[in-house]
Amino acid sequence: MARLKDVYLKTVAPALFKDFGFKSPMQVPRITKIVINIGLGEALQNPKAVEAAIGDLTMIAGQKPVVTRAKKSLAAFKLRQGMPIGAMVTLRNDRMYDFYDRLVNLALPRIRDFQGLSRKSFDGRGNYSIGIREQIIFPEIEYDKVDKIRGLEVAIVTTAPNDEQGFALLKALGMPFRD
């Protein structure tokens, strides 16, 4: 079992149950999945960019990503329907907890001038999104082998019905928020 899952089950879930006064243990918010996405605008000029991004995402997530393709053609961007424009991976269960643990304890502290994450990135339904500007903050990525610095988005999906409960869950699991 993942270390963070054990922490959640033994300390975080009972504390949230008590704090919010839930009637059933199934009401306690939990993380359901983490979606990591890399959008590749340069994939139109450089088809090898998709393969490089897939390699980076595989190293970061520990799981093979799926290539995302354009839904519609857009003449302004010289984009045709079905062209590869990104890569994404959905993590659940143990891989999700392992990634969250590495994100909070290893990757985020390596960001330059890191002051903590904003509380405003919740979506109103308890889900949290983080934009990361450089994939090299993850220890799995070797700086010398990176062809281009790319950003990525991390969406943390929870069962929390509102931002207050989502914030309490992520804060209890060690997310470094700005106060």
From Swiss-Prot:
GO CC aspect terms: ribonucleoprotein complex; ribosome
Keywords: Ribonucleoprotein, Ribosomal protein, RNA-binding, rRNA-binding, tRNA-binding
InterPro entries: Ribosomal_uL5, Ribosomal_uL5_bac-type, Ribosomal_uL5_C, Ribosomal_uL5_CS, Ribosomal_uL5_dom_sf, Ribosomal_uL5_N
GO biological process: translation
Gene Ontology molecular functions: rRNA binding; structural constituent of ribosome; tRNA binding
Any matching Pfam family: Ribosomal_L5
Function: This is one of the proteins that bind and probably mediate the attachment of the 5S RNA into the large ribosomal subunit, where it forms part of the central protuberance. In the 70S ribosome it contacts protein S13 of the 30S subunit (bridge B1b), connecting the 2 subunits; this bridge is implicated in subunit movement. Contacts the P site tRNA; the 5S rRNA and some of its associated proteins might help stabilize positioning of ribosome-bound tRNAs.
Oligomeric form and interacting partners: Part of the 50S ribosomal subunit; part of the 5S rRNA/L5/L18/L25 subcomplex. Contacts the 5S rRNA and the P site tRNA. Forms a bridge to the 30S subunit in the 70S ribosome.
Recorded family membership: Belongs to the universal ribosomal protein uL5 family.
Protein name listed in UniProt: Large ribosomal subunit protein uL5
Top-level taxonomy: Bacteria, Bacillati, Chloroflexota, Chloroflexia, Herpetosiphonales
Gene: rplE
